[in-house]
Curated annotation (Swiss-Prot):
Disulfide bonds: none
Entry binding sites for NAD(+): 52, 137, 157-160
Job description of the protein: Catalyzes the reduction of FAD with the concomitant oxidation of NADH. NAD is the physiological electron donor. Subsequently, the reduced flavins diffuse to the oxygenase component NphA2.
Native organism: Rhodococcus sp
pH dependence: Optimum pH is 7.5.
Protein name in UniProt: NADH-dependent flavin reductase
Enzyme Commission no: 1.5.1.36
GO terms of biological process kind: 4-nitrophenol catabolic process; pyrimidine nucleobase catabolic process
Subunit structure: Homodimer. 4-nitrophenol 2-monooxygenase complex consists of an oxygenase component NphA1 and a flavin reductase component NphA2.
Record key words, sorted: FAD, Flavoprotein, NAD, Oxidoreductase
EC top class, as a word: oxidoreductase
Induction per the UniProt record: By 4-NP in the presence of NphR.
């Protein structure tokens, strides 16, 4: 095995782990929840620690820092939404990451009482079925109660930067 980024560090520090895991390209999601169907009650945050868990039953998982307000909000509401962002939604991602950039206007679509971002490629409205402590994060497992998806190119995050996704090979799905 050759090393290109430097020598092996025998100590696994949070910074080194973050840098290593940042080399795993991921989609970008906005996790949302609300106390009621009112845009003033919406709480959202950018997250890329999201994964599918099971197709039957339909389960997904999002990992939220225990220091984040979102962790408490999800526990209080028992629901959350996942909006998988399209390639042109970097300003929205920055907004929900707490950056100074403000998108022109954030609009929501409500599905099963859960706010989801207009213009996203995918909407998943979830009910929390389990929450597991995991170090400095909580793993919130959600049952997908309703979904919606569209075609388009996703927003991708790699090594701390947003990227575009270029298709390689044929532009045909694998049968799904």
């Amino acid at each position: 095995m050759t090393e290109t980024a430097g020598e092996l560090d025998p100590e696994v520090t949070p910074l080194h782990l973050r840098k290593a895991l940042g080399r795993f390209a991921s989609g970008v999601t906005i996790v949302t929840t609300a106390e009621c169907e009112d845009e003033d009650s919406v709480h959202g945050m950018t997250a890329n620690a999201f994964t599918s868990v099971s197709l039957d039953p339909p389960l997904v998982l999002v990992s939220i820092s225990t220091r984040a307000k979102m962790d408490t909000k999800i526990r209080e509401t028992g629901t959350y939404g996942i909006s998988i962002l399209a390639g042109d939604q970097e300003p929205v991602s920055l907004h929900f990451a707490g950056a100074a950039h403000e998108p022109d206007r954030v609009r929501f679509v409500w599905r099963r009482g859960v706010p989801l971002l207009e213009g996203a490629l995918v909407h998943l409205a979830c009910t929390v079925v389990a929450s597991h402590p995991a170090g400095d994060h909580t793993l919130h497992v959600g049952r997908v109660e309703q979904l919606w998806y569209d075609d388009g190119h996703p927003l991708v995050f790699y090594t701390g930067s947003f990227r575009s996704l270029e298709l390689l090979g044929r532009d045909e799905p694998w049968g799904f």
